[in-house]
Amino acid sequence: MTTPANAQNASKTWELSLYELHRTPQEAIMDGTEIAVSPRSLHSELMCPICLDMLKNTMTTKECLHRFCSDCIVTALRSGNKECPTCRKKLVSKRSLRPDPNFDALISKIYPSREEYEAHQDRVLIRLSRLHNQQALSSSIEEGLRMQAMHRAQRVRRPMPGSDQTTTMSGGEGEPGEGEGDGEDVSSDSAPDSAPGPAPKRPRGGGAGGSSVGTGGGGAGGVGGGAGSEDSGDRGGTLGGGTLGPPSPPGAPSPPEPGGEIELVFRPHPLLVEKGEYCQTRYVKTTGNATVDHLSKYLALRIALERRQQQEAGEPGGPGGGASDAGGPDGGGGEGGGTRGGDGPEEPALPSLEGVSEKQYTIYIAPGGGAFTTLNGSLTLELVNEKFWKVSRPLELCYAPTKDPK
């Protein structure tokens, strides 16, 4: 028994979805009208959702009509996910796909040379990575300056490990008139009452610095002061006002941070050394794409921070404190433990770091030990090393304050 023809036609009726029912038809453009399309929207239309690159050998799903690269969709089906990566509709096998040569022809019309398009993308990526590297360098320099300033401030506030012991042996620096000390005075007072034992270990003989530390501690205080001068001589005399021992050398290099590419020896200009204005040699390690302006701003910030920390430590106001550019936080602060300068005048206002600029200092180089050459601020250190230095030792630069910074 055969089925009536009208029944067959009724079963094959196309049922429209809500989207198709509300969709208005668009007329095809048959003349030479041009429509401007942004590259971003065009790229999203021609992009494969799997590899996020331009479609290559386009394959279209038969049910949901989503487009993918041939290799991408075949690999996705082989991995076990028998569904469309975009809408999760069921895909049995490669038989649910069909090639789309018309879309490939459209892509070849828009981008005639695919190799040129890929080369342009590579150039854009290289330029973006270079810009990000410069931003990372500047942020790394700022972060390093903040961390160094924080650590130096902590070193100023924290007493040295040997200062507590020498202070107690001298009978207490803050209370010179008391007869009850903490160190040898207590042990000598309680010696007759306690059981006999081994004699207390006396410190090594004191020198001329004993009288400057033990101001009110008697003879034992003088001996303790001498020991303090010998033990803390290599620390730059942090217990007293600079008479205990020679200060630490100002040009002592700090260990360079890892990851740098160029090592620098930063010295003041010889004319400044003769005048006694600057005497500190700085050792810096940084990447080759840092510019001379970066170094100038780093130097201005560093010197401003050091002067600020010297004023906070009370070095300029004390009778024995040193006030030089190379002093750092280790110079003495006068009598009384190097904290403040005694009963001196009121301290000046701390220098502000807001006006620091790379124009405050000029960078020079003396290639071959000859005349000094002023370096342009836009030059990178790698270019300076190749153009002026050309030797296999750290790059040596000199700095001096700019006479008329603009």
From Swiss-Prot:
Residues 205-228, 235-244, 315-342 have a biased composition (Gly residues). Residues 30-234 are annotated as: Necessary for transcriptional repression. Its EC number is 2.3.2.27. A zinc finger (RING-type) spans 48-88. It is found in: Nucleus speckle. A motif (Nuclear localization signal) lies at residues 201-204. The modification Phosphothreonine is found at T24, T215. This is E3 ubiquitin-protein ligase RING1. It comes from Canis lupus familiaris (Dog). The gene is RING1.
